[in-house]
Each structure stands twice: as structure tokens, then as C-alpha cells.
Amino acid sequence: MLDGKTIIVVAADQGLRRSVAFALEVEGYYTESYDSVQKSEASCREALCAIVDDDILRTEPQAAAQFLSNRGGRAILLVDGLSALQPPVDYATLTKPFTGADLLGVINSLVVAAK
């Protein structure tokens, strides 16, 4: 069951999903992880936010763009330094590699902005 402390992690790479989920669970968040945007859609409605790896934009470009814009500012896109994306409008970005503290800082800023 989802609640206000559940964070959805969407990444094609299983290792990245596990690492992000572990970092969040250590801090007391619940996580649900998915390897595609389509599989995560239903869970995102009640989640605190969604974290999406930019590789998903390459494999599901239209679905991922729609997914990010539908989160109402409650999304974080994980990008590498070489990602050539337009400036985000409705989501935050976090550049890889990042630390757990970096990730928590972005999540906390989303929570504050949502209040």
C-alpha cells in the first residue's frame, strides 16, 4: 500500500534501482521499483515522488516525457553529465554520480515546494 513516504524508482538498470531504493529505505522511505514507465503508472498516483533514470527517456521517449510532466513537480530525473535534455519544467534533475545526501536534498526540496 502506498502512502506519503513511498517513492517510486523507475530505471532499466536493476543495479541502479536497487542502489537508489537502498539509499531511500535506509532513510525511512518505502520504495517501489520498476523497469519501465508503463509498469509504474498506477503506483505513482499516491507516491511522494518518482525518480526516473534518463535511460528510460531513450527506451520509452514519449511515455517517459508524459510521465514526467504528469507528476505535478513530484519527479526527479537522474541524468549523466552528457545528457542533452531541455531544461526541466515540471521536474527536478540530479546528475549522476550522486550521493545519498544529494538525493535526499532534492527529495526534501520537492516536499517543501509541495507544501
Swiss-Prot record:
Keywords: Plasmid, Repressor, Transcription, Transcription regulation. The keyword Transcription regulation applies. Interacts directly with FixL. This is Transcriptional regulator protein FixT. Prevents transcription of the intermediate key regulatory genes nifA and fixK by counteracting the activity of the FixLJ two-component system. Acts as an inhibitor of the sensor hemoprotein kinase fixL, preventing the production or the accumulation of its phosphorylated form.
